[in-house]
Design a protein with these regions (language model features):
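Extracytoplasmic thiol/disulfide redox context detector
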Residues: 2-90, 207-219
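Periplasmic c-type cytochrome electron-transfer domains
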Residues: 24-34, 122-127, 196-206
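Extracytoplasmic/secreted proteins, especially bacterial periplasmic and envelope-associated proteins
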Residues: 46-49, 60, 64-67, 90-94, ...
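Solvent-exposed loop/turn segments at secondary-structure junctions
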Residues: 53-57, 84-88, 116-120, 152-153, ...
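Polar helix-capping/helix-linker motif
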Residues: 20, 126, 149-150
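Structural microenvironment flanking redox-active thiols in thiol-disulfide oxidoreductases
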Residues: 72-96, 106-134
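C-terminal cap of thioredoxin/glutaredoxin-like
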Residues: 136-219
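Sec/Tat-exported extracytoplasmic proteins
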Residues: 54, 69-72, 99-103, 113, ...
Length: 219
């Protein structure tokens, strides 16, 4: 909860860096246009975050993103897609999708997983450890195990990997806006900035791109 409150306070206080003073974000610098647009949510401007739980940069960015998501207008939606290549990453992807399928992936549980890995030093590198972790976060372990091993969850892994590849994601965290543009803290930020400042820059770029999508602009 403290992670969320601090991030919301930063945004509410207007402490995001005064970036793009010279006319706004620039394509090829702060964001990239996808070679092939991706299909998004019908009737909405969809922002997709690509991340993985063990990523320290994703851990810094997550509370900023969550606070930003709470302020989104009705025509904008946020979707998270966990990615990764190692066996542990894939286990964590299954954890995410199992919780999502159960309707148990609340902001508190999502933040609790990050905190467990990055603050408590928990290493959930097998199914038993993952079940123990989500149980501590208030999730029914029996229902979770059933969801964790369901075919639909396994299929989601392949879909997420295909989406990340189609979006050209090669680093995380990354944001894809309206299926047309990709940005992220490492791209939107500048050398020497803190990771929090870079994350705020990325969200400022996302806001810019949402406006572009809403106005019908494609570049």
């Amino acid at each position: 909860m403290k992670r969320r409150t601090a991030a919301q306070a930063l945004i509410a206080a207007g402490l995001a860096p005064a970036a793009f003073a010279q006319g706004g974000p620039v394509e090829g610098r702060q964001y990239a246009r996808l070679a092939q647009p991706l299909q998004g949510a019908a009737g909405r401007i969809e922002v997709v975050e690509f991340f993985f739980y063990m990523c320290p940069h994703c851990n810094v960015f997550d509370p900023l993103l969550e606070a930003w998501a709470h302020q989104l207008p009705a025509d904008v939606s946020l979707r998270r897609v966990p990615v990764g290549v190692t066996l542990m990453h894939k286990l964590h992807q299954r954890m995410f999708y199992a919780l999502e399928a159960m309707g148990a992936l609340t902001p508190q549980v999502h933040a609790g997983i990050f905190n467990a890995f990055h603050r408590a030093g928990i290493e959930a590198n097998d199914e038993a450890a993952i079940v123990a972790l989500v149980s501590k976060l208030g999730v029914d372990p029996v229902k979770f195990k059933a969801a964790f091993n369901a075919f639909g969850v396994q299929a989601k892994l392949g879909q997420g990997a295909a989406l990340a590849q189609a979006a050209g994601v090669d680093t995380v965290p990354a944001l894809v806006v309206a299926g047309r543009w990709r940005t992220g803290p490492s791209m939107a930020g500048t050398p020497g900035q803190s990771e929090v400042a870079q994350g705020q820059q990325a969200l400022a770029v996302a806001d810019f791109l949402v406006k572009q999508a809403r106005s019908g602009k494609t570049s």
